[in-house]
Amino acid sequence: MIQSHVSVMLNEMLEALSPKAGESYLDCTFGAGGYSKAILESCNCYVTALDRDPNVIKRAEEIQQNYGERFDFVETNFADSFAKLKEKKFDGIVLDLGVSSMQLDIADRGFSFLHDGPLDMRMSGQGLSAEEFVNAAEEKELADVIYKYGDESFSRRIAKRIVEYRKTARIDSTGKLAEIVRSSIGFRKGKIDPATKTFQAIRIYVNDELGELEQFLVNVKNILKKDGRLVVVSFHSLEDRIVKNFFKENSEKPVVRSKYAKDDMTIDPNKWLKIITNKALAPSDKEVGLNIRARSAKLRAAKAIYE
């Protein structure tokens, strides 16, 4: 059963995407369908949604029943979507890089340190699981992954404790891993759960989330129409840095050759984006108060000025 999910920065996403009737949009991270539904309700437009999680298919079918041919769903991760989308181009593309409540709140999915379940964390159910990684990786690799993808300053201490624990028993549940992490660094008053960063790091690693994001951005120009908008909502500094650098590297203000000829400008055709959000947008205090999972969200948007 899919749990209730609250889409993060929904209004800001719609404002940045600016959907128009008759146009086509790509929701690269369907999840519980919050973004897709909001775009479809905003005007008489079309949405193609992607997700590698087979558990969302039922929700996609529900939306398709309501919106008919205006909605289409493709089961794939966004990095591998280009072949399945063939030569289709879109007027706008949106990515919500966060983990949905339907993944976090269902214990059997193995994402949550709050709900005990099998230590899995795979979004597609395929490939290396968190259990396999945690029980097989060398101490240094564990520490490096937890530090790099979780920005966890206690990564070495946590990795050492994991290796010590698995000498006596296999770490096969989220509850076990969470307790190992907590016992390594302890609770700090007013701080997030000590297991938060470690679980984030392992999830990012086993799903190759950053690699998929980088691969998608390299190819996104091929599916975004001229004047089409790219909107990305990220949830931690590594994702945001990738998006920020991509926007910066692919956008450039026109250079005026002469102060007397303002229309005489040279433009690098490889700089195909115009940044819409000069700085990353953050959720309002009100939204964070209603949905604590929004606290780390950042939204960046850009527009294609060339195809």
Swiss-Prot record:
A single GO BP: rRNA base methylation
Keywords for this protein: Cytoplasm, Methyltransferase, rRNA processing, S-adenosyl-L-methionine, Transferase
Principal EC category: transferase
Entry function: Specifically methylates the N4 position of cytidine in position 1402 (C1402) of 16S rRNA.
HAMAP family: 16SrRNA_methyltr_H
Record's catalysed reaction(s): cytidine(1402) in 16S rRNA + S-adenosyl-L-methionine = N(4)-methylcytidine(1402) in 16S rRNA + S-adenosyl-L-homocysteine + H(+)
The EC number(s) this enzyme carries: 2.1.1.199
Species: Rickettsia rickettsii (strain Sheila Smith)
Molecular function GO labels: rRNA (cytosine-N4-)-methyltransferase activity
Source taxon at top rank: Bacteria
Name listed for the protein in its UniProt record: Ribosomal RNA small subunit methyltransferase H
Annotated GO CC locations: cytoplasm
